Swiss-Prot record:
Mode of membrane association: Multi-pass membrane protein
GO CC, alphabetical: chloroplast thylakoid membrane; plasma membrane; proton-transporting ATP synthase complex
Function: Key component of the proton channel; it plays a direct role in the translocation of protons across the membrane.
Organism expressing this protein natively: Morus indica
Protein name: ATP synthase subunit a, chloroplastic
Length: 247
């Protein structure tokens, strides 16, 4: 009886811990679901920036590209090169997915450094870059997982699952575990880097508010771009691996 009571108390303690939140959050009720309003607001802003800039740049395409059209053509060519390198000759259908991931993460990361989110007052909590929230990075990582499972099943059918027993069935648990660790590593890498960058800038601004934080902010912009590239490259690599076989 004592063992059973102890187990129940332990489970209750774990349940209580799972409900602990860091900081304050603003929630909306949509239907029967409770959603994180701060992430939705900042994500909508990022999506609006991407859609607005692309529409303005290419609404009247020219034979001789203008500055905006030329920039977006360069970005598209860059994303195509990344996709082709990681996926191979069948990269074409995956360019929109990889491009969407790269651009959303890139603009989200930069918005944390360039947009004055803090001046917008909310009833609870405060606004920040979408990728500063673990919910966003986990969602992006899960989308990537769905994408590479879909790519593998589309290319190989049920034979795709044969990779789990290659090169030997003994590795079955490890190969299964690998598919679970991929989204974890993607999400926590992106979340940790963006959160750490913003925290460093906030601390330096509070200590030395004039000159010192500026180089750190420029470094943060650089690392934010690198993180977007790493995420997109790994997503393309996982898709290419699922289509070609186990490496």
């Amino acid at each position: 009886m004592n063992v059973l009571l102890c187990s129940i108390n332990t489970l209750k303690g774990l349940y209580d811990i799972s409900g602990v939140e860091v900081g304050q959050h603003l929630y909306w009720k949509i239907g029967g679901f409770q959603v994180h309003a701060q992430v939705l607001i900042t994500s909508w802003v990022v999506i609006a920036i991407l859609l607005g800039s692309s529409i303005i740049a290419v609404r009247n395409p020219q034979t001789i590209p203008t500055d905006g059209q030329n920039f977006f053509e360069y970005v598209l060519e860059f994303i195509r090169d990344v996709s082709r390198t990681q996926i191979g000759e069948e990269y074409g259908p995956w360019v929109p997915f990889i491009g969407t991931m790269f651009l959303f993460i890139f603009v989200s990361n930069w918005s944390g450094a360039l947009l004055p989110w803090k001046i917008i007052q909310l009833p609870h909590g405060e606004l920040a870059a979408p990728t500063n929230d673990i919910n966003t990075t986990v969602a992006l990582a899960l989308l990537t997982s769905v994408a590479y499972f879909y790519a593998g099943l589309t290319k190989k059918g049920l034979g795709y699952f044969g990779k789990y027993i290659q090169p030997t069935p003994i590795l079955l648990p490890i190969n299964i575990l690998e598919d679970f660790t991929k989204p974890l590593s993607l999400s926590f890498r992106l979340f940790g880097n963006i959160l750490a960058d913003e925290l460093v800038v906030v601390v330096l601004v509070s200590l030395v508010p004039l000159v010192v934080p500026i180089p750190v902010m420029f470094l943060g912009l650089f690392t934010s771009g690198i993180q977007a590239l790493i995420f997109a490259t790994l997503a393309a690599a996982y898709i290419g691996e699922s289509m070609e076989g186990h490496h």
